[in-house]
Amino acid sequence: MFTVRKERIEFIVKGSKVIGHLFIPEDGKVKKYPAVFIDGPMTSVKEQVTGVYAKSLAELGFITLTIDHRYFGESEGTPRQYEKFPDKLLDIKNALDFLKKRPQVDERFISLVGVCLGAGYVVAAASEISGIYRLAAIAGYYRDTQEMKANNLHDFNSKVSSGKKAREQYESTGKVLYIPAASLNEEAAMQTKDTVDYYTKRAAVQNYENSFAVMSREFFTKFDVQIYAEKVTRPFLMIHSQKALSPHWADRFYNNVRTEKSRHFVESRGQTDFYDNFRIINECVQHTSKHLLPVKS
């Protein structure tokens, strides 16, 4: 077990400052470490689930980085609370460039880990970035927009349309239309009991805002994670549970991955057990660390 030093870092993406936490294992003997960028659920910030996994993996000898994406937390960018996946992918690319410049990082062994929707973001980013060592997805939210359309095309199109209208309103007036990110009592982006409990109670950190820009729906609704399964080219680990989000989507994604892959199931009561239940987190971290350890030729 390594002693870990946490460093506040920043880099610029399209003129906006991105703030992150870099977790550095301190050994005194090792000069270069494998590195991991960890991405998390929609609207989340670095002090929540990604920070937990970042610290835990750093204790096992990985340099880890987690950030507040643009529009969230301490990072700059407007409008606030804007869940726009093309911009999140660009943030990930810049985060990897940041890691490559750190003298302690072994560039040969930089991996991506995603939790919940972060799993979708990292597999999408990896399809556009060369040099990724390995991928791991923990309790991933493998959105299948084709199934969503088949189940309720009107609802799908309505959400896209409402997002477009909200964006046009913002562009013409500067006014952003918001709904809660998590709530059981009103329209919200997330409406499951365990998710609401996590964001409004257990992980209601000062840096988190329980808010979601409706204009996000123009992009977020159309984000199809399933299309990236066949684009996965790096060794892939999936960790999931039958009680996590949409296990049948996880099965579909895994079955369509054509490269080296492995899967591990854990027992959970729901999705957010993966966020702050340390029995489950420790199990996930152990399997993830083994998957990401460098295999040197």
Q: Residue locations for each model-derived region?
A:
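N-terminal cap/lid segment of alpha/beta-hydrolase-fold proteins
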Residues: M1-K31
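Short beta-strand element of the alpha/beta-hydrolase
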Residues: K31-P41
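The serine-hydrolase catalytic nucleophile loop
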Residues: M42-K55, H69, A250
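Catalytic nucleophile-loop/oxyanion-hole region of alpha/beta-hydrolase
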Residues: K46, F72-E107, S111, F278-E283
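Conserved alpha/beta-hydrolase
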Residues: S56-E76
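Alpha/beta-hydrolase-fold enzymes
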Residues: V123-K201
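Short beta-strand/loop motif that positions the catalytic acidic residue
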Residues: V232, M238-H240
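Catalytic active-site module of serine/aspartate enzymes centered on a nucleophile-bearing elbow/loop
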Residues: E267-S297
